[in-house]
Swiss-Prot record:
Tagged with keyword rRNA-binding: yes
Record lineage: Bacteria, Bacillati, Bacillota, Bacilli, Lactobacillales
Cited function: Forms part of the ribosomal stalk, playing a central role in the interaction of the ribosome with GTP-bound translation factors.
Family: Belongs to the universal ribosomal protein uL10 family.
Matching InterPro entries: Ribosomal_uL10, Ribosomal_uL10-like_sf, Ribosomal_uL10_bac, Ribosomal_uL10_bac_type, Ribosomal_uL10_CS_bac
PANTHER family linked: 39S RIBOSOMAL PROTEIN L10, MITOCHONDRIAL
Organism: Limosilactobacillus fermentum (strain NBRC 3956 / LMG 18251) (Lactobacillus fermentum)
UniProt name for this protein: Large ribosomal subunit protein uL10
GO BP terms, alphabetized: translation
A single cellular component GO annotation: large ribosomal subunit
NCBIfam families xref list: PRK00099.1-1 (NF000955)
Length: 167
């Protein structure tokens, strides 16, 4: 192999390593058996959520995780491998890929990283069923507003009762 090819592969390993270390989550999937239309649809769904999916050679991935906390992922680098990277919402890739895998038997989630930790397949599936960040924020806002509404109603009821007695 020429020095230029070796340098190119080393640069690719460095790039994948940087993506993995920067990502909030990276889910490893086997896409074997999906049609071109299905892969295009999956990529569109992921892109709409600001998630990048890349097909990466297993050897490149193995070298990219060497010496990191993600070495346990090496067991998932078998067969055709694609990785969905998210720098924002750590749960979004798991949710989208799980839903897609439920609808398309050919897609197999093999493992991944969520919130900078290697997760088991069971943990990834559990994360996928959790509400998203926006849903959780909305639930929190609602929970915080509810006591204030009750106090406002109580104060209004006392004020209305005072107005009735004064009349």
């Amino acid at each position: 192999m020429s020095e230029a090819a070796i340098a190119k592969k080393a640069e690719e390993v460095k790039s994948v390593n940087a993506q993995l270390l920067a990502a909030e989550s990276a889910i490893v999937v086997d896409y074997r058996g999906l049609t071109v239309e299905e892969v295009t649809d999956l990529r569109k769904q992921l892109r709409d959520a600001n998630i990048k999916m890349s097909v990466i050679k297993n050897k490149i991935l193995e070298r990219a995780v060497e010496g990191t906390d993600y070495e346990d992922l090496k067991a998932t680098f078998v067969g055709p491998t694609a990785v969905a990277f998210s720098d924002e919402d750590p749960i979004a890739p798991a949710k989208i890929l799980k839903k897609f895998a439920d609808d398309h038997d050919a897609l197999e989630i093999k493992g991944g990283i969520i919130e900078k930790k290697v997760q088991t397949l069971d943990a990834i599936n559990e994360y996928a069923t959790m509400p998203g960040r926006e849903d959780l924020l909305s639930m929190l806002a609602s929970a915080l507003q509810d006591p204030m509404r009750k106090i406002a109603r109580a104060v209004k009821a006392v004020a209305d009762k005072g107005d009735e007695e004064a009349a």
